[in-house]
Regions:
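C-terminal "closing" transmembrane helix and its immediate cytosolic amphipathic cap
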Residues: 2-3, 106, 229-230, 234, ...
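Membrane-interface helix-loop-helix regions
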Residues: 45, 49, 97-171, 283
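Alpha-helical transmembrane segments and terminal signal-anchor/GPI-anchor hydrophobic tails
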Residues: 211-306
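Short, Lys/Arg-rich, polar N-terminal cytosolic tail immediately upstream
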Residues: 1-11
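Transmembrane alpha-helical segments and their boundary/interface "anchor" motifs
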Residues: 54-57, 72-135, 306-317, 322, ...
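Functionally critical transmembrane alpha-helices in membrane proteins and complexes, commonly lining
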Residues: 10-73, 93-96, 209, 285-287, ...
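Structural signal for the C-terminal ends of transmembrane alpha-helices
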Residues: 69-77, 105-110, 180-189, 220-230, ...
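Solvent-exposed interhelical
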Residues: 171-200, 225-236, 334-338
Length: 383
């Protein structure tokens, strides 16, 4: 079977970007929309049924495992493993520090505006600084630098930006891939590879953050298939079926679910195992986009590439902006137009600023990454 060219990977950027937007929209609902009945109550239902942040984060992890595995298809030397490990923390830390400093500046400027906004929308997530309480935390510039450099990667400190909880998972999962991928490529029999991966997934268990390593291993398997030309080509009908199944698994919730999910809920009853369904979703969506020319063409267009490039900054920026700027808009607008109108205004301002800043952070990160690549490089074979 012919191998998929590097250009055929571009649709995954579009998929990553859409997943980031889903997370952002879900967080807008979770942090701004009042709980209980009311004009905006359908948004809470939409969040529960469609805007699945857990499935989106799983997709991020599976995509990371996929992309990080590909270079080892041609080079399994220990030198590549060492360089990959040395580069991973510096590669991630630049934007985490930048966003923690931005969040610190927003907190310094806006104070407890998020708490006052919570008195308007009666929203627990807003009241608790999006489940990252500031009480007792070091919210100084030094604290922001410490969190961005080390806290989010080690103990999982997320006082400044709660979505940064994914960073220690990203670092851990990446290191596992750097060790596992070259070893798995050396094993030529696929059934042995799959048995090893299945045992590893069972071994990591169902307790966070270690359980998310399974997502990276699923991505590694897909990456090995890609590197060895083993991903299938999908007809349009097969692609529709794969995407439909992928979306079915994507919308599966760790909480109450519609009757259509009853059989799946029996198999995956708790939050700690729900991500297995989301792994299946990620795999189905990825292979459909890579294997179907029509989907490949749609998601590989400029909009998808740009959105994918902005996805990480968007993911990191939106919550600090919502808690400060969004909270201020909610407070200022509610007396004049009511909560039902103020909430969309706050969400719109938050999302608009996130999309305005994301390209700048993307370019800054690109410069950082290029510089890092010049400093830490894989030695040529034979040197």
């Amino acid at each position: 079977m012919a191998k998929h060219g590097a250009g055929k990977l571009l649709p995954l950027e579009g998929l990553r970007g859409i997943a980031a937007v889903v997370v952002m929209l879900g967080h807008m609902v979770r942090g701004l929309v009042p709980p209980g009945p009311g004009p905006l109550a359908p948004l809470n239902t939409l969040h529960e049924r469609v805007l699945n942040g857990g499935a989106s984060v799983t997709l991020f992890f599976v995509l990371s495992g996929f992309i990080l595995t590909l270079p080892f298809g041609k080079d399994q030397r220990p030198a590549r493993v060492v360089v990959a490990m040395l580069k991973r923390w510096p590669r991630l830390v630049f934007l985490t520090v930048v966003v923690c400093v931005i969040s610190w500046a927003l907190i310094w400027q806006s104070g407890d505006i998020y708490a006052r906004a919570a008195l308007v929308n009666h929203n627990w997530w807003m009241a608790t600084h999006f489940n990252a309480p500031l009480a007792g935390a070091d919210v100084s510039l030094v604290g922001a630098l410490t969190d961005g450099l080390f806290g989010v990667f080690g103990p999982g400190d997320v006082h400044f930006d709660s979505p940064l909880w994914t960073m220690r998972v990203e670092l851990l999962g990446s290191l596992v891939v750097f060790v596992a991928a070259p070893l798995l490529f050396l094993v030529r029999r696929w059934w042995v590879r799959l048995v090893v991966v299945a045992v590893a997934i069972m071994a990591v268990g169902t307790n966070p953050p270690v359980m998310y390593v399974a997502d990276f291993l699923v991505g590694a398997v897909l990456g090995m298939l890609q590197a060895e030309g083993g991903l299938p080509v999908f007809s349009n009908r097969a692609a529709v079926l794969a995407v439909g199944a992928g979306l079915y698994f994507y919308c599966f919730s760790a909480g109450p679910v519609p009757v259509i999910y009853a059989p799946l809920k029996l198999l995956l009853p708790t939050a700690n195992v729900a991500h297995y369904a989301w792994e299946a979703s990620s795999a189905l969506l990825m292979v459909a986009l890579l294997g179907n020319p029509a989907l490949n063409g749609v998601f590989g267009q400029e909009w998808g590439v740009r959105l994918g490039a902005w996805s990480f900054p968007l993911y990191l920026l939106h919550v600090p902006l919502m808690l400060s700027v969004g909270g201020a808009v909610l407070l200022l607008a509610t007396p004049h137009v009511g909560v039902s109108v103020a909430v969309p205004l706050a969400a719109g301002m938050t999302l608009g600023l996130a999309f305005l800043l994301a390209p700048l952070l993307t370019e800054m990160d690109k410069i950082w990454t290029l510089g890092l690549g010049k400093i830490i490089r894989v030695p040529k074979s034979g040197n």
